[in-house]
From Swiss-Prot:
Gene Ontology MF terms in the entry: calcium ion binding; mannosyl-glycoprotein endo-beta-N-acetylglucosaminidase activity; toxin activity
Gene Ontology biological-process annotations: carbohydrate metabolic process; symbiont-mediated evasion of host immune response
Principal location listed in the UniProt entry: secreted
Listed InterPro entries: EndoS-like_Ig-like, EndoS_F2-like_TIM-barrel, EndoS_helical, Glyco_hydro_18_chit_AS, Glycoside_hydrolase_SF, LRR_dom_sf
Annotated protein name in UniProt: Endo-beta-N-acetylglucosaminidase EndoS
Transmembrane segments: none
Statement: the UniProt record of this protein carries the keyword Repeat: yes
Organism whose genome encodes this protein: Streptococcus pyogenes serotype M1
Alphabetic keyword roster: Calcium, Glycosidase, Hydrolase, Leucine-rich repeat, Metal-binding, Repeat, Secreted, Signal, Virulence
Length: 995
């Protein structure tokens, strides 16, 4: 149980030899001198050593040795401790030799179940010296189906265990209450405070060791006191640890041991009469044991104490509650059935403080300061839990309470919650009559959802048995079940009652040869999609405590082998598909009505193929006419296409504007794949006939069918990666565009991408600065890296470059390339409402590799954060403008090492905020070498006195060929490399001639 109040006792291991010495093991007439932690202690004759006490457990021996260690030289205290140990050993002997009564056979468990965790240290037999303990576990009433032994503080030699085994268990079993032992998760793993699992020599982490540990756990915690099962508490406070650190290997081992326990007891165990239970605070996706452990458990108990347990936690980003009760169940429903699922609340623990105050039961009334009792459940969270049922799957198994020995005690009032020293009347110990538990059990017993399914629900016995086997035994299961129901017993003669299903996901009717008619009188209520009418009884974050009703999808219907079926009526269900109808096996069909749906029956569709098969069967039996076959008044639903046919658009340069959406994004498709691009297409579709009759409703107009693209957005990117969201494109300049369309539902993933070419096509540039390495500069290095992450980021991202108005970044590009353009964005590009000052001046520079050593730069780049080491290739000045971005052309630069300087011209708090910097061009291996080849060619062409005019003309032609390919609209690396190679060869020949 997730209880902050409980502090688990950790016992240190103290070596017996250093504590007591060998002298304590002997019995001399005179006083013995004993060494305990290097201190001399005198002990009277006749007192035994701790290790000589044969019945005490090793854990209890450790405790007594620790007490002796602390006692030091206080002879009287040592004597008292040893006497206490001797008495403990006698009690342990009594426990070891007690006779366990014969087990009383128990009836099968049926919901609605009520469980309660009884704290052993509050049983009056736990420690007779504590006179304030007035409750006994054996007094739990018959309304408690599951009594959990929540053990802490009670010694393993306490006579409570004898009382439990010889009196409590037989008495509780006789009234129908099962008694379950709870152990922490870590007991299955070894490591810190892991009980018998600490003995790694006896229980090593091996397959055989895990089997042995599982058996020892069941023997110790179930069979030893003749209990009815085992409960493993899976939560963060009980996670396996080694040296106080969470142990991943221990978690994995605990799963294996859990499985081994499940092979001994529980639904898959050798002994199925003993229950195997898991309780947890985790959501399913955070519970490491649930996936592999679920098949082995009878029940799952989930602790949902307090307001957040009921309502979930509010998530401000998504603006909705998370970890709600329904979400918690949905997660676990993948692994267990609803009748296995129980939810829990907590009674008020005495002296509980902030962090352990749940307010699940009623508080003490202000005027009732002397009385700490309040047994009224009206309006409590506990009562709401008793009434709550999952919206899907079926009815829950029941509820449980923690600290049931506090049943009836009022909760401490909220106004005292933070007064740590305050002691309220509710902190007193009271004898309980379990009025609250009884009342909560009564609430569940009155819940009609738990009524058993009977012949009134399903008159056909074979059908009833099939439903109860697959769905559940309770009436409330019928309206909640959202799985698959397969009916394949040929003995089924009637399907009456299936209309009680409201959320069925799939209905399989297979080989039911005695069924002659299928229509809405027997088919599930959700043959037609609808809204969930089940309302929550829980408190929610909504002001009116009402949730928006969820949509219930239509049931998927599979019909095959109904050879006796004569009449099939699926009219008026708003269904879009006939898939699932094995029409060829419906060999006796005489009448079919599929009118009033949303079916596309166009030629070539799956719907049409199925319908034609049924039509043929009916024609062969009774003939096809308007009385035997109805298929009219269809209103097919229009859907957005998955893909769009038009992926490119070529336009001439002209002084015009083009609507991109109307040119590139259009069309509506049925779920059968029939594409309709225009109203003319729709009219032709609407006029299509089957046997002289139209299937599309004549009053179903195109505007009702077509989908709307009105709220779709567009992102238009030009060849320099400049973007706009304007759906209208001007064609007044030669350019190539990438056009992305986005749906209102998802603004991040394009539903369609197309290329638009105005004039001659251009190759799209690449941002060569994306992923660049920041190697120096004055800017904050963490935020400087964000400048090159390829995205503007969100409005809340911190991308300030530092505590000064002027900041620099030195960076290296990832790959060689030919740089033709650059762009940077002001903060207003990502946040129009920003108060950050825009960049007023900027300079873009490349490293002066001609005059300075690159290796020195790389060894200590911050020393090179000076203008003299850099060559400025472009500058920017705002001149009073507040632009969101600046971009400009560059002239075929090939440097990989760059420096950029941004200046807001403000005070030291007006730091530059630059979401993104782009260095634009084309990847080109050996770009620097290629450009040097061009430079060399230009230099040689000036040496007219050394070469003939013919040679100079040839050199010029090859130089121009390379420059043309470098500046071509279509950037062709192959052509560039070929021209560079030719020019290089030409240069080398001229240089040889020169020599």
């Amino acid at each position: 149980m997730d209880k902050h109040l409980l502090v688990k006792r950790t016992l240190g291991c103290v070596c017996a030899a250093t504590l007591m010495g060998a002298a304590l093991a002997t019995h001399h007439d005179s006083l013995n001198t004993v060494k305990a932690e290097e201190k001399t202690v005198q002990v009277q004759k006749g007192l035994p050593s701790i290790d000589s006490l044969h019945y005490l457990s090793e854990n209890s021996k450790k405790e007594f040795k620790e007490e002796l260690s602390k006692a030091g030289q206080e002879s009287q205290k040592v004597k008292e401790i040893l006497a206490k140990a001797q008495q403990a050993d006698k009690q342990a002997q009594e426990l070891a030799k007690m006779k366990i009564p014969e087990k009383i056979p128990m009836k099968p468990l049926h919901g609605s179940l009520y469980g309660g965790y009884f704290r052993t240290w509050h049983d009056k037999t736990s420690d007779p010296t504590e006179k304030d303990k007035v409750n006994s576990m054996g007094e739990l009433p018959k309304e408690v189906d599951l009594a959990f032994i929540f053990h802490d503080w009670t010694k393993d030699y306490s006579l409570f265990w004898k009382e439990l085994a010889t009196k409590h268990v037989p008495k509780l079993n006789k009234q129908g209450t099962r008694v379950i032992r709870t152990i922490p998760w870590r007991f299955l793993a070894g490591g810190d405070n892991s009980g018998i699992a600490e003995d790694t020599s006896k229980y090593p982490n091996t397959p055989e060791g895990n089997k042995a540990l599982a058996k020892a756990i069941v023997d110790e915690y179930v069979y030893k006191y003749n209990l009815d099962g085992l409960d493993v508490d899976v939560e963060h406070d009980s996670i396996p640890k080694v040296d106080k650190k969470e142990d991943t290997a221990g978690v994995e081992r605990s799963i294996q041991v859990f499985e081994e326990i499940g092979k001994l007891i529980g639904p898959k165990g050798v002994d199925k009469s003993r229950l195997f239970i898991m309780d947890s605070t985790y959501m399913a996706d955070k519970n490491p044991l649930i996936e592999r452990g679920a098949p082995y458990i009878n029940l799952l108990l989930v602790q949902v104490y307090g307001s957040q347990g009921e309502k979930g936690g509010w998530e401000p980003v998504s603006n909705r509650p998370e970890k709600t009760m329904e979400e918690r169940w949905q997660g676990y429903s993948k692994y267990i059935r609803p009748e296995q699922y129980m939810i829990g609340f907590s009674f008020y623990e005495e002296n509980a403080q902030e962090g352990n105050l749940w307010y699940d039961i009623n508080s003490r009334k202000d005027e009732d300061k002397a009385n700490g009792i309040n047994t009224d459940i009206t309006g409590t969270r506990a009562e709401r839990y008793a009434r709550w049922q999952p919206k899907t799957g079926g009815v829950k198994g029941g509820i449980f309470s923690y600290a049931i020995d506090r049943d009836g005690v009022a909760h401490q009032p909220k106004k005292y919650a933070k007064q740590k020293e305050f002691k309220d009347a509710t902190d007193n110990i009271f004898h309980s009559d379990y009025s609250v538990s009884k009342a909560l059990k009564t609430v569940m017993l009155k819940d009609k959802s738990y009524d058993l399914i009977d012949e009134k629900d399903f008159p056909d016995k074979a059908l009833r048995e099939a439903v109860m086997a697959q769905v559940g035994t309770r009436k409330g299961d019928l309206e909640r079940f959202n799985g698959t129901l397969r009916l394949d017993n040929p003995a089924i003669q009637s399907l009456e009652g299936l209309n009680k299903f409201k959320k069925l996901a799939q209905l399989d009717l297979i080989g039911l040869s005695r069924i002659t008619k299928l229509d809405r009188s027997v088919l599930p209520a959700n043959m037609k999609p609808g809204k969930d009418t089940l309302e929550t009884v829980l408190e929610t974050y909504k002001k009116d405590n009402k949730e928006e009703p969820a949509t219930i999808p239509p049931v998927s219907l599979k019909v095959s082998g109904l050879t006796g079926l004569k009449e099939l009526d699926l009219s008026g269900f708003d269904r879009e598909t006939l898939a699932g109808l094995d029409a060829a096996t419906l060999t006796s069909l005489e009448k079919v009505d599929i009118s009033g749906n949303k079916l596309d029956l166009a030629p070539g569709t799956e719907n049409r193929q199925i319908f034609d098969t049924m039509l043929s069967t009916i024609s062969n039996h009774v003939g096809s006419n308007e009385q035997t076959v109805k298929f009219d008044k269809q209103k097919p639903t229009g859907h957005y296409p998955d893909t769009y046919g038009k992926t490119s658009l070529r336009l001439p340069v002209a002084n015009e504007k083009v609507d991109l959406q109307s040119q590139l994004l259009f069309g509506t498709v049925t779920n059968q794949g029939t594409l309709i691009n225009s109203e003319a297409d729709y009219k032709a579709y609407q006029n299509h006939k089957i046997a002289g009759r139209s299937f599309v409703d004549s009053n179903y107009h195109y505007n009702n069918f077509k989908v709307s693209y009105e709220n779709y957005t567009v992102k238009v990117t030009d060849s320099t990666l400049g973007t706009t969201t304007d759906k209208t494109l001007a064609t007044d300049k030669e350019e190539t565009y990438k056009v992305d369309f986005f749906s209102p539902a998802d603004k991040t993933k394009a539903v369609h991408t197309a290329k638009v070419i105005v004039g001659d096509e251009k190759t799209m540039m690449v941002n060569l600065a994306e992923g660049a390495t920041v190697i120096g500069g004055s800017a904050d290095p963490v935020n400087a890296r964000k400048v090159f992450d390829g995205q503007l980021g969100s409005e809340t991202d911190n991308i300030s470059l530092g505590w000064d108005s002027k900041q620099s970044i030195i960076f290296k590009l990832k790959e060689d390339g030919l740089i033709k353009h650059w762009r940077f964005f002001n903060d207003s590009a990502r946040n129009p409402e920003t108060t950050n000052k825009p960049i007023q001046e900027a300079s873009l520079q490349i490293f002066n590799i001609k005059d300075y050593n690159l290796d020195n730069l790389l060894e200590n780049p911050n020393k090179f954060d000076d203008e003299k080491y850099w060559i400025t290739v472009d500058t920017y000045s705002a001149q009073g403008e507040r632009a969101t971005a600046f971009s400009n052309t560059l002239n075929n630069i090939t440097s990989k090492y760059w420096r950029v300087v941004f200046d807001t011209k403000g005070d030291r708090y007006s730091s530059p905020v630059v979401p993104e910097l782009q260095i634009l061009g084309y990847p080109l291996p050996n770009a620097d070498t290629i450009m040097k080849t061009v430079t060399t060619a230009k230099e040689l062409s000036q040496q007219k006195d050394k070469f003939s005019q013919k040679m100079l003309d040839e050199l010029k032609i090859k130089e121009m060929a390379l420059e043309t390919s470098l500046n071509s609209k279509i950037f062709d690396v192959t052509a560039i490399n070929a021209n560079a190679g030719v020019l290089k060869d030409c240069i080398e020949k001229r240089q040889l001639l020169k020599k």
